[in-house]
């Protein structure tokens, strides 16, 4: 079975945790221990987020004032290399030595006229108090937004249109490789007036890009791995309920928040609608049961309405 796994940012760095290389590697190791359990008899493609990492690089770059800060597309490429290296190494230590790995930088086409460029919504970097965020917004001309009980920098997040490296990914899978790609939603690019490909200052949502990746690869299963066991209605309330199975149409009517579960649900809907195959949102720690169809929230065209866990 060909499986595309979208690793949430929590798999690399837990909320509020210091953004050290040691912490990130430890979290990657924990994630890879789960992924290794489903490697036998499956083809694996791993995508991942990069919000905290790209924000950290932007902060580090801003601290060195002798040169202009590097643009977000370049920082995205840097994080894809760093995180891909960690996943490749840690997962490689858990599967047989002869299993090949490859991390591919993935350029993703976006529409330069996407409305997202005028409405930044994608959180990147560390969390701040309201006072810290307001000060940084003024100093650095950032857009900021609330993220839970804290605040973060937000940047444009245009929709992914095309993944340019999709053919090399297919070639690697055909040769038995585990592939890490579309890191951080891929590197946002567009064609200029001379039809030259250029990078652009943005961060693509990794779940939406991963859904496009899974669709392009004819994946049998698309897993969005996060830090909760399922998608919930009335989250955080005494009457919260975990969704077991839902049709794309039914779950789309629930209106999940754009800054949290919303993009994950939309990505799962996109994949299920386009392919007729299943997408599952669930905890990385449940990934074995997710593959067996026993855990997570499964979004599928094979059902009508919504079913909940007892």
From Swiss-Prot:
Coiled coil ranges: none
Gene source species: Haemophilus influenzae (strain ATCC 51907 / DSM 11121 / KW20 / Rd)
Subcellular location: Cytoplasm
Gene behind the chain: arcC
Keyword list, A-Z: Arginine metabolism, ATP-binding, Cytoplasm, Kinase, Nucleotide-binding, Transferase
Cellular component terms (Gene Ontology): cytosol
Membrane-crossing segments per the record: none
One Pfam family named in its UniProt record: AA_kinase
Name of protein: Carbamate kinase
Known partners and oligomeric status: Homodimer.
InterPro entries in the cross-refs: AceGlu_kinase-like_sf, Asp/Glu/Uridylate_kinase, Carb_kinase
Family: Belongs to the carbamate kinase family.
GO terms for biological process, alphabetical: arginine deiminase pathway
Gene Ontology MF terms in the entry: ATP binding; carbamate kinase activity
């Amino acid at each position: 079975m060909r499986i595309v796994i979208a690793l949430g940012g929590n798999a690399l760095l837990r909320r509020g945790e210091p953004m050290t290389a040691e912490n990130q590697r430890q979290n990657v190791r924990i994630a890879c221990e789960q992924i290794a359990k489903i490697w036998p008899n499956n083809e694996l493609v791993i995508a991942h987020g990069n919000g905290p990492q790209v924000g950290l690089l932007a902060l580090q770059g801003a601290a060195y004032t002798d040169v202009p800060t590097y643009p977000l597309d370049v920082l995205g490429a840097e994080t894809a290399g760093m995180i891909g290296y960690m996943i490749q190494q840690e997962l490689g230590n858990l599967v047989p030595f002869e299993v090949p790995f490859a991390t591919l930088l993935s350029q993703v086409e976006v529409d330069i006229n996407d409305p997202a460029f005028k409405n930044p919504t994608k959180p990147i970097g560390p969390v701040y108090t309201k006072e810290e965020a307001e000060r940084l917004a003024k100093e650095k001309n950032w857009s900021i937004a609330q993220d839970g009980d804290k605040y973060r920098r937000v940047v444009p997040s245009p929709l992914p249109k095309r993944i340019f490296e999709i053919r090399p990914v297919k070639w690697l899978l055909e040769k038995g490789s585990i592939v890490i790609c579309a890191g951080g939603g891929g590197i946002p690019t567009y064609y200029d007036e001379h039809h030259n490909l250029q990078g652009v200052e943005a961060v693509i949502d990794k779940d939406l890009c991963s859904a496009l990746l899974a669709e392009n690869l004819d994946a049998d299963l698309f897993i969005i791995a996060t830090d909760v066991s399922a998608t919930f209605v009335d989250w955080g309330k005494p009457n919260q309920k975990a969704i077991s199975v839902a049709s794309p149409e039914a779950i789309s009517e629930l209106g999940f928040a754009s800054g949290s579960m919303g993009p994950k649900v939309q990505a799962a809907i996109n994949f299920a609608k386009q392919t007729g195959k299943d997408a599952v949102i669930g905890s990385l720690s449940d990934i074995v049961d997710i593959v067996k169809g026993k855990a997570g929230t499964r979004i599928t065209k094979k059902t009508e309405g919504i079913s909940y866990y007892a």
